[in-house]
């Protein structure tokens, strides 16, 4: 798809995780989307491969690519096979913009062998109807879109962060913000 797209990173640093994934309603100065992923390749009901990694937006003179597009480019070029079913799970710092949501929905419509679940820390411009429609288009294409809760943040910390065996430390307001964002997402997807 795009030869300038970098391969996924193995993990991120703790400060990056706490800054980028904090589930605030309004998250000023968080201008990047980080996407942690797992890909399970399934043949005859058995997991035959397992990939994990981290993408972030690539914004430079050569490439302007949101994290979702980076993932799709890598996945199509390096992983995707018509003879394998895939369960893909994303943990994102922001929900997709309308353009990325549309591209992902179109990709899934063309590849019935790929199932996607998205856990997101925050909803991007959730008051904007275009962004709401993007989330609905994903849901209509069979994507389970969910708000990250404590166990999801902990999972990301344990699997996608260079954590030096330190435990995940939840921030003040995590549970309250989760409830608020979950209600907003339910309203959008109704």
Curated annotation (Swiss-Prot):
Residues reported to bind Zn(2+): 66, 97, 100
Residue ranges of the TM segments: none
GO cellular component: cytoplasm; nucleus; P-body
Primary location group: nucleus
Coiled coil spans: none
Its EC number(s): 3.5.4.38
UniProt entry tagged with the keyword DNA damage: no
GO biological process, one term: negative regulation of single stranded viral RNA replication via double stranded DNA intermediate
Entry keywords, A to Z: Antiviral defense, Cytoplasm, Hydrolase, Immunity, Innate immunity, Metal-binding, Nucleus, Zinc
UniProt function note: DNA deaminase (cytidine deaminase) which acts as an inhibitor of retrovirus replication and retrotransposon mobility via deaminase-dependent and -independent mechanisms. May also play a role in the epigenetic regulation of gene expression through the process of active DNA demethylation.
Designated name of the protein: DNA dC->dU-editing enzyme APOBEC-3C
Taxonomic source organism: Gorilla gorilla gorilla
Gene name linked to the record: APOBEC3C
